[in-house]
């Protein structure tokens, strides 16, 4: 039996994290959406298309895993999820007011997490209609359920709605902007175009669905040895039962020859991500002189695929990402009728046609397909080294957007440095491929915790800067205005310490604790030392202090903390400098906040974060809502307890800092000595090398 005194109950209360433009952080949206679906406990055949029972007939259509508008608003009023582990108890609760609940429902719709099966062209929520999770929404739920270690699998994960493998982006922990490089954009482009041209036709067969075993990452290995007692209720095996998780003949409920048409107004069009964007083949352009282009696609189709098949939640962010395909020279516009592509502005439209550039064609490497040539009226072909502009052709250039658009040039890694783990970890594209390799090797947690700890260390540097600023202000000034600054710094200090503790708890409960969902293979003494700190009876984690949630002053803790490391909202600036190479000098327990661990080891390369260019806040009243996201219970103690807990909190963080750094270095050693060596021998690595060679030639 687990000692109750050594069971960690982490309690905190906070608002949604927001970007500089006021948008809710992507991870917060995915979390509240997942808990929302878990609390709804959706079942099959719950609702029919006709809500009046006396009108039901044999021809009435039933929709699986649906819920009503009223059920959604009511459920969000009191969301609660409890996950019991060996030494921790995670209790997550949200109490969301109706105004914010309606706004979140709208966000879930615009993010393609929900749709209305009765009216698949509807893009906004409405009362008296049924809502249903999309394949993208189910994929988000699947990831959350696995990460948090939920013992009971939601039924929808075993259905045909579970069919999507999302492309997931890494984001800045400060601005929530996408961390990208040219190489990552190239990988995304290859995935979007598919293994072969996906030419749409009403007679096409439905896209095949991946088997559930690959989506659930489930392997029924009876040879696995463990010292723990068999507890079927803690796993998913009992739920799977007689379901054939290797079935390759599954059919998606969203498959439809009309709603998958790239010209349709369907809210959701893609239910698998590996088939590629839907193209038009041999489409004719021009008025007096007809010109036929082998493969074309619209900007609406690009945007639709990004929204359906990646974890992007905000519409304008998808537009910015789609524009990067043009910026990097992978696609070129068609400026002949019926295409209505703007010469100076990238816009999303069903009538804005593009085709692959020569560079884009080289990257996709469709086997068995001829080059994407343009056939002129006289029968001759125009190679895609040239781009159509009106009735004349000019050479295709890589630079298709001005620097004034706010896009920063990313530095490409070279093939000569590809055999170094540091460079692979630094480039978002190579890191993505390395992550996929680790997933196949069943050790992706080594990379995940390595990055999580680096973010924790970055937070600690910000905390140290705040402490230093407070001490400097106390020594130099005592005026009223300076006292206000000190109060602001105090508020920021408590918020920053709060976030550091939350990150420490997440790292511990997800990777280090015995029985955690992604338990690391580390030395027993190291695990025990961390557990002694986290589970100490007098740890401030058991009396977690709240931040001031209702302070309307502009000098809030959030603004003070974010001002330390921020980027301009209208540019693709640089992300926080989180070193992805472990420090060579380990700190001891008495030496807190050592600067050696934060030196930027690879200054010659800085991936760029993708930031939205415009503010998108359709409902101002919602933005000012005092609705609270609560983890555990409602902490409404006064600030006195917060101040009293602060020294103990810093003491815990000082003790955790060197231990987490040791874990980070150990994970780096494991990846460098084992996983990376296997990665360099894999087919994925060889393909990456070939792709980089193509980049260097372009």
UniProtKB/Swiss-Prot annotation:
Gene Ontology cellular-component terms listed: plasma membrane
Record region (Disordered): 545-586
Residue ranges of the region described as Fungal-DR: 10-203
Segments of skewed composition (Low complexity): 551-570
Record's keyword annotation contains Metal-binding: no
Biological process, per Gene Ontology: cellular response to pheromone; conjugation with cellular fusion; intracellular signal transduction; negative regulation of signal transduction; signal transduction
Domain DEP: start-end pairs: 273-358
Induction / repression: By exposure to pheromone.
Location of the RGS domain: 420-689
InterPro entries: DEP_dom, RGS, RGS_sf, RGS_subdomain_2, WH-like_DNA-bd_sf, WH_DNA-bd_sf
Processing and modification events after translation: Phosphorylated by FUS3 and KSS1.
Residue list for modification Phosphoserine: 252, 408, 539, 587
MF-aspect GO terms: GTPase activator activity
Swiss-Prot/TrEMBL keywords: Pheromone response, Phosphoprotein, Signal transduction inhibitor
Function noted in UniProt: Desensitization to alpha-factor pheromone. Is involved in regulating the signaling pathway for responding to mating pheromone.
PANTHER family, per database record: DOUBLE HIT, ISOFORM B (PTHR10845:SF192), REGULATOR OF G PROTEIN SIGNALING (PTHR10845)
Additional notes on this entry: Present with 5980 molecules/cell in log phase SD medium.
Domain notes: The fungal-differentiation regulator (Fungal-DR) domain is only found in fungal regulator of G-protein signaling (RGS) proteins that regulate differentiation pathways. It is required for function.
Name of the molecule in the record: Protein SST2
């Amino acid at each position: 039996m687990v000692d109750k005194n050594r069971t960690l109950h982490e309690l905190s209360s906070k608002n949604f994290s927001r970007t500089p433009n006021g948008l809710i952080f992507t991870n917060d949206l995915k979390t509240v959406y997942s808990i929302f679906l878990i609390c709804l406990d959706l079942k099959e055949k719950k609702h029919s298309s006709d809500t009046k029972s006396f009108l039901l007939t044999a021809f009435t259509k039933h929709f699986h895993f649906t819920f009503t508008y009223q059920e959604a608003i009511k459920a969000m009023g009191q969301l609660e999820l409890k996950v019991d582990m060996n030494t921790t108890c995670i209790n997550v609760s949200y109490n969301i007011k109706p105004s914010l609940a309606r706004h979140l429902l709208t966000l879930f719709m615009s993010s393609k997490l929900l749709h209305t099966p009765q009216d698949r062209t509807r893009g906004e929520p409405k009362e008296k209609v049924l809502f249903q999770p999309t394949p993208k929404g189910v994929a988000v739920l699947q990831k959350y359920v696995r990460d948090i270690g939920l013992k009971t699998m939601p039924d929808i994960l075993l259905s045909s709605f579970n069919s999507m493998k999302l492309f997931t982006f890494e984001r800045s922990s400060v601005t929530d902007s996408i961390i990208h490089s040219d190489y990552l954009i190239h990988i995304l482009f290859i995935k979007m175009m598919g293994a072969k041209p996906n030419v749409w036709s009403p007679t096409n067969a439905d896209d095949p669905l991946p088997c559930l075993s690959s989506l659930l990452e489930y392997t029924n290995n009876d040879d696995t040895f463990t010292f723990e007692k068999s507890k079927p209720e803690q796993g998913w095996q009992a739920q799977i039962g007689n379901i054939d998780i290797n079935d390759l003949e599954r059919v998606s409920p969203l498959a439809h020859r009309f709603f998958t048409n790239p010209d349709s107004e369907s809210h959701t069009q893609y239910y698998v991500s590996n088939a590629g964007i839907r193209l038009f083949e041999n489409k004719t352009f021009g008025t007096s002189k007809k010109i036929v282009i082998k493969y074309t696609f619209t900007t609406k189709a690009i945007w639709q695929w990004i929204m359906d098949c990646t974890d992007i939640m905000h519409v304008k962010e998808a537009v910015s990402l789609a524009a990067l395909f043009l910026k990097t020279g992978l696609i070129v516009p068609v400026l002949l009728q019926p295409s209505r592509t703007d010469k100076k502005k990238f816009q999303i439209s069903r009538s804005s046609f593009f085709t692959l550039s020569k560079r884009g064609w080289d990257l996709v490497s469709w086997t068995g397909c001829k080059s994407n040539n343009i056939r002129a009226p006289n029968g001759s072909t125009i190679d895609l080294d040239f781009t159509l502009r009106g009735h004349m052709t000019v050479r295709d250039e890589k630079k298709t957007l001005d620097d004034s658009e706010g896009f920063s040039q990313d530095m490409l890694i070279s093939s000569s440095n590809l055999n170094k783990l540091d460079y692979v970890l630094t480039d978002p594209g190579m890191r993505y491929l390395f992550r996929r390799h680790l997933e196949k090797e069943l050790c992706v947690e080594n990379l995940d915790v390595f990055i999580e700890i680096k973010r924790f260390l970055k937070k600690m540097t910000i905390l140290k800067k705040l402490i230093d600023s407070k001490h400097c202000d106390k020594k130099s000034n005592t005026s009223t205005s300076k006292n206000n600054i000190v109060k602001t710094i105090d508020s920021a200090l408590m918020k920053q310490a709060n976030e550091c503790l939350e990150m420490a708890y997440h790292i511990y409960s997800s990777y280090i604790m015995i029985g955690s969902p992604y338990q690391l293979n580390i030395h027993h003494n190291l695990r025990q030392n961390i557990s002694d700190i986290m589970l100490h009876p007098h740890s401030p984690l058991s009396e977690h202090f709240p931040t001031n949630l209702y302070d309307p002053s502009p000098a809030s803790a959030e603004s003070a903390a974010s001002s330390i490391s921020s980027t301009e909202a209208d540019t693709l600036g640089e992300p926080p400098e989180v070193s992805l190479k472990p420090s060579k000098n380990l700190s001891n327990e008495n030496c807190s906040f050592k600067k050696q661990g934060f030196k930027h080891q690879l200054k010659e390369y800085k991936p760029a974060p993708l930031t939205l260019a415009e503010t998108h806040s359709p409902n101002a009243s919602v933005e000012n809502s005092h609705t609270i996201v609560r983890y555990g219970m409602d902490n409404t103690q006064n600030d006195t307890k917060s101040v009293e807990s602060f020294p103990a909190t810093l003491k815990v963080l000082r003790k955790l800092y060197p231990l987490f750094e040791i874990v980070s270095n150990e994970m780096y050693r494991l990846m460098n000595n084992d996983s990376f060596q296997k990665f360099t021998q894999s087919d994925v690595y060889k393909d990456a090398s070939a792709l980089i060679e193509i980049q260097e030639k372009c």
